[in-house]
Regions:
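Glycine-rich Rossmann-fold phosphate-binding loop(s) that bind the pyrophosphate
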Residues: 11-12
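N-terminal Rossmann-fold NAD(P) dinucleotide-binding loop
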Residues: 15-16
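Aromatic pocket-lining residues of Rossmann-like dinucleotide-binding sites
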Residues: 22, 89
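Conserved acidic E/D residue at the C-terminus of a beta-strand in Rossmann-like folds
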Residues: 33-34, 111
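Short alpha-helix immediately C-terminal to the canonical SAM-binding loop
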Residues: 39-40
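Conserved SAM/SAH-binding loop
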Residues: 54-58
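Residue-level detector of conserved catalytic or cofactor/ligand-binding positions
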Residues: 105-113
Length: 113
């Protein structure tokens, strides 16, 4: 099995479940969130690295290793933020990105022109 470096932005319900499953599969997972409380809980319960900060910040993504990531997953509660995080991750060198988007009118933003 090929193990990946995966960065997950958003340590909410979806992000924490993804982090748990992916770390169980032995992927190298880094969680990014603004909430130190959530990250502390995840850090204590899961085999993950954590970075506290704004996932839409270039500096925070660099600290979290976006430039070396095989996959960046953005699953915060804000569609626009998820798209922005993925755009930044891709520009920094992430091989693949996935943005959680519920508003289908925003889908065109991430499509290649």
């Amino acid at each position: 099995m090929i193990f990946m470096k995966i960065m997950i932005i958003g340590d909410g319900k979806i992000g924490s479940v993804l982090a748990e499953q992916l770390s169980k599969e032995k992927h190298e997972v880094t969680l990014v969130d603004r909430s130190g409380v959530r990250l502390d809980q995840s850090n204590n319960e899961l085999d993950v690295m954590v970075v506290e900060g704004d996932g839409a910040s270039r500096e925070v993504q660099m600290e979290a290793g976006a430039d070396q990531a095989d996959l960046v997953i953005a699953c915060t509660g804000a569609d626009e933020l998820n798209l922005l995080c993925c755009l930044i991750g891709k520009k920094l060198g992430a091989r693949h990105t996935i943005a959680r988007v519920r508003n289908l009118s925003l889908i065109h933003i991430s499509e290649p022109t």
